[in-house]
Curated annotation (Swiss-Prot):
GO molecular function, one term: 1,4-dihydroxy-2-naphthoyl-CoA thioesterase activity
Source organism of the structure: Prochlorococcus marinus (strain MIT 9215)
CDD domains in the record: 4HBT
Keywords: Hydrolase
Any Pfam family: 4HBT_2
Protein name: 1,4-dihydroxy-2-naphthoyl-CoA hydrolase
Record pathway: Cofactor biosynthesis; phylloquinone biosynthesis; Quinol/quinone metabolism; 1,4-dihydroxy-2-naphthoate biosynthesis; 1,4-dihydroxy-2-naphthoate from chorismate: step 7/7
Keyword Hydrolase: yes
Length: 150
């Protein structure tokens, strides 16, 4: 499997994604950014429940709250647009990682998102090291190559 398989995803803009002006509602860009990295880890081979557990089934000891996020709109994104979503994850330190998302329409970057997550122990709420499987996904993603494409 090549990094492009889990780092370059597709999205079609639907009616419900947009506001009355026919462009995407601002909050959807961050939602799509998060959904892109969720989909990416699944394609890479990390079981969804290992990162986003169902606490009614089993209690995970790690949670990944968002500690910072931002979105930049560079051009209108409208109903019916097909977008390529390129993600670029990287490790900030032992307990923080960032996922950048680039939204491409017809070869042009139209938006970008950034989400930073912190790895915490669920009981103590102390910072803990990122799990090995998440570190492997970040390393395998070869962020420098992915960023050059955007």
């Amino acid at each position: 499997m090549k990094p492009a398989d889990w780092l370059i995803l597709q999205r079609k803009v639907r009616f419900g994604d947009c506001d009355s002006a026919g462009v995407i509602h601002f909050h959807n860009l961050l939602k799509w950014s998060h959904e892109a990295w969720e989909e990416s880890i699944e394609i890479y081979g990390i079981p969804y429940k290992d990162i986003f557990p169902d606490f009614s089934i089993r209690k995970s000891q790690i949670v990944f709250p968002i500690v910072n996020c931002e979105a930049n709109f560079l051009a209108p994104i409208k109903i019916g647009d097909f977008l390529k979503v390129k993600i670029a994850p990287h490790k900030i330190n032992t307990h923080l990682f960032q996922v950048n998302s680039f939204f491409i329409k017809n070869g042009n970057k139209v938006a970008e998102g950034k989400i930073i997550h912190c790895s915490l122990d669920i009981d103590s709420r102390n910072k803990i090291e990122l799990p090995d499987q998440l570190e492997r996904w970040i390393e395998a993603s070869n962020v420098s190559t992915n960023l050059k494409e955007c």
